[in-house]
């Protein structure tokens, strides 16, 4: 999740921060949307990586190259700007977990009448 105060509350949790750091150390997939990428930034996980977040939180992405893209994938880290990018964010996660095909899955879910 992202947004406030959710992101602030997640970052305040030692359990959450320890789990995120362990996942990063293990090379597992990390994904955050909206303001939540700032957690990765504050934990030092974005140094030398490309990342995006909700406008106004860019300075919190310590050491990252902020892209401003709707969704940015760099290695095992996926970040997204906000709720408007949620479908693309999900597709990027599917791509990582399935080895591709996320956009095809997204296309199948869309209503042709829209």
Regions found by a protein language model. Give the residues of each.
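Active-site-adjacent pocket-lining segments in enzyme domains
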Residues: 1-114
